[in-house]
């Protein structure tokens, strides 16, 4: 079947055959092929089914704009749907599958949609599936989604690696065609730092499929020699297989490099794709031009191809597009193709030229039909004939391929990514890049310059000017001599063609045809943005690279205005689809986010801790012992043991901030709502930090270790936020204060030693006297351990309500000190306990956490109203705390809740309803913020924020959870369930 | 996607290193009118064009900066240390 491969011609290596499969069928291609060229060489015309009508589709282009030849490449986690066969380099063993067909590509049931097409026009689903509404989600959408679509994503994990990189340069050249190569060479020789990117596998762009000679060399050889010279320069980086997909502020360009998408088994030491962010002093857009399709009946039939694509398959890949091709052209480039086909031994059946006369003197064998158009095609899964409309009649000519040459549209996407709108040029009959772009220039085909010599010259001249702007000396630019047979590109666009009967496609990928555009205009959707959304023209993976200008031209014609008046839709990144893998980079799996482990993590693990993830931290949750069947049993044992003997808990993850400076006390006085200025040295104090809106931000204890040195603790979750906030206060609000802040969370291992026997255990390792007299409640100071072997900080603070201390030691000593404390307390019954027990202990004591400090709570709501300093002239939140809404009597207030029946339970998040009240939003009295089973009380206990709760102790309420269908009669009470007189703290 | 912030301490750095607080407003005096406080805490301009914001170089020098940027083009016109500006305003 490989009979379409020509014996000579092209850049493919006929000595290196490559085996691949398409829909399971084995085929052969050559080194240097794309999947598309290999399929064509195998005579494969039909490669896909269209989006809506499931029409047979072939290969339309030879590049990035391909709307039809989308296939799934690879298998398992490497399966990549919607791969453009025109961009996929062939490799040995490549597996490709066609998409959007069932049961097979050749026999596709979905093609029945074609019969329904009168009902499937633009906006059909807006009109058709309106009623009954519930069917939309259940029936219409699933059915439509199955019928209309592209490839399917793999559900398996991607086994490959991706990475991100930054690059910096003086000049970024986008596109390594004639313009880009000439520019890069000029700037590179002048010594500028140049990055040249091209989406193709080889630098050269159109040179690779051009038969011209440059300085006596074949165009492709010129491209190779030029890129070789560029690669030899230390100041030049050439990135192939790299698509610049976006232009962003700061002249930063996004680009994706497909490092290993052209190999069967990616090497594990390299990424498969690399996302570049390129910071460019200047950039030159040398992306060339896209050939414009012609809109005639059946222009989507396999075998119809862009003329430039046919040139590429012929000259670069050595593949004949057919044996009896015809050419439909509106300009002279069609004749160049005809001559090249004939030179390759392929006889052109006919050249259909829309103009009365050509600009070139064609002397080939093809029949010339002037002032004529192709208005239709015939054939099943491949073209068999064209219908030529000329002189008022229609003639059928048998062909097996058709090239269409409809003129050229500059590829200006990137130039429009920062808000600039394309400008219609009547002279060039094309949309050009917006003028006066900062940092980006457009040259060559992208600026509607035509002709090889002109592009080479323009690329060099623009680079020279940029180099001079950079202040570098620029050696004289060598003028190259070009011999080319390419005809001049005629600007006259051909929007509409007479005599069309079959569907004439405007947007191939979305199955939008001529009549859809007309319908949109008739129904009032003639604004280009509305027409796009109503017809879907210009959407999906190709983003209308081929269709947009034709759609605009047709709308303009229907409205009787110039395309300038219609304008374009908005160009946004990405130019072509970028994989999620590339955007994610290395942030997958366990690299998705960092893991934070306390310095006591290994100690906890050694003692059998069960860990829980809280934010980035792994915290020891409880420490099961043999014989315990549930976590509740372990937690109850730990709770009772703390109340009876002593427990040791890792609290290292609390945020710790050291605050120093001669104004440190004044600073704390301003960031906390309670007073800190006169906190004595050697004392700790509980502090409440507000936001400027008056609500509580965070809480914690802060100790004055020296006159001008404080040790602050924050909650675990808000540690980073508090640090940022304090820095804001110190730098922006009060820069005149002498204060220094340092995050010391990671420097200290901190452990709570709580329980009636805490002191006698701790005293065994602490050198100083820590009796109640010498070291009373809220004492805080640096202590010496083991006879001066180590120093730490000791705080007599208690979250559990017991006699308790927190000991901070340098992080690296954490594990040995924790072990030493367990050893010291062995005879006193010490046990490790985790955050579950910590939580039960604090709920029993009515201590709050961020469950209660939920961002809508002020100090008075928690019973801390008297803590707020009335005397301080200023603190964060002072002004707004006075608002009437924040002092209203019906504010939510902290209360305790217990079930009437101790056997019953309820959970956090449940709502509080007055007894007998219906469960409505208006009757909502508040909600349960924290709950736990309390071994001390012998039932579930909870904290809740309840409207006017402080005055409702003793009231019977209903705890209701609609989510779980639970309602539990309960009683509001004092939130302190254990030792309300705080006697145990002061022993 | 990839704007660069010219940090006065660290040079041009990617925006991912920064966190943005919002409008660079001056805090009212403690005894200012409640209207001023409402403005400061809740009300924001939403200009199309030039805008000054507090940015924190969280993963860099940890300084708070005043970034003057254009909300349309994202171009940054100026970037200075917020403390320096606050001090010079206090002198006025």
From Swiss-Prot, chain A:
Keywords assigned by UniProt, alphabetized: Cytoplasm, NAD, Nucleotide-binding, Oxidoreductase
Organism: Rhizobium meliloti (strain 1021) (Ensifer meliloti)
Residues the entry annotates as binding (6R)-5,10-methylene-5,6,7,8-tetrahydrofolate: 714, 806
The family this protein is said to belong to: Belongs to the GcvT family.
Main location (coarse class): cytoplasm
The record's free-text note on cofactor binding: Binds 1 NAD(+) per subunit.
Origin organism lineage: Bacteria, Pseudomonadati, Pseudomonadota, Alphaproteobacteria, Hyphomicrobiales
Compartments (UniProt record): Cytoplasm
Primary gene name: soxA
Biological processes per GO annotation: tetrahydrofolate metabolic process
Stated name of the protein: Sarcosine oxidase subunit alpha
Listed cofactors: NAD(+)
E.C. numbers: 1.5.3.24
InterPro entries in UniProt: 2Fe-2S-bd_N, FAD/NAD-bd_sf, FAD/NAD-binding_dom, GCST_C, GCV_T_N, GcvT/YgfZ/DmdA, GcvT/YgfZ_C, Sarcosine_oxidase_asu
Assembly, per entry: Heterotetramer composed of subunits alpha (SoxA), beta (SoxB), gamma (SoxG) and delta (SoxD).
Gene Ontology molecular function: any one: sarcosine oxidase activity
Positions contributing to NAD(+) binding: 198-199, 206, 244, 445
Reaction catalyzed: sarcosine + (6S)-5,6,7,8-tetrahydrofolate + O2 = (6R)-5,10-methylene-5,6,7,8-tetrahydrofolate + glycine + H2O2; sarcosine + O2 + H2O = formaldehyde + glycine + H2O2
Chain's role: In the presence of tetrahydrofolate, catalyzes the oxidative demethylation of sarcosine to yield glycine, 5,10-methylenetetrahydrofolate and hydrogen peroxide. In the absence of tetrahydrofolate, catalyzes the oxidative demethylation of sarcosine to yield glycine, formaldehyde and hydrogen peroxide.
GO cellular component: cytoplasm
UniProtKB/Swiss-Prot annotation, chain B:
Binding site for Zn(2+): 7, 10, 57, 61
One term of GO molecular function: sarcosine oxidase activity
GO-annotated cellular components: cytoplasm
Database matches in Gene3D superfamilies: Folate-binding superfamily (3.30.2270.10)
A single GO BP: tetrahydrofolate metabolic process
Location (main, coarse): cytoplasm
Superkingdom in the source lineage: Bacteria
EC number: 1.5.3.24
Catalytic activity: sarcosine + (6S)-5,6,7,8-tetrahydrofolate + O2 = (6R)-5,10-methylene-5,6,7,8-tetrahydrofolate + glycine + H2O2; sarcosine + O2 + H2O = formaldehyde + glycine + H2O2
Record key words, sorted: Cytoplasm, Metal-binding, Oxidoreductase, Zinc
Compartments it resides in: Cytoplasm
Reported function: In the presence of tetrahydrofolate, catalyzes the oxidative demethylation of sarcosine to yield glycine, 5,10-methylenetetrahydrofolate and hydrogen peroxide. In the absence of tetrahydrofolate, catalyzes the oxidative demethylation of sarcosine to yield glycine, formaldehyde and hydrogen peroxide.
Subunit and interaction comment: Heterotetramer composed of subunits alpha (SoxA), beta (SoxB), gamma (SoxG) and delta (SoxD).
Family: Belongs to the SoxD family.
Protein name per Swiss-Prot or TrEMBL: Sarcosine oxidase subunit delta
Taxonomic lineage from the root: Bacteria, Pseudomonadati, Pseudomonadota, Alphaproteobacteria, Hyphomicrobiales
Name of the gene this protein is made from: soxD
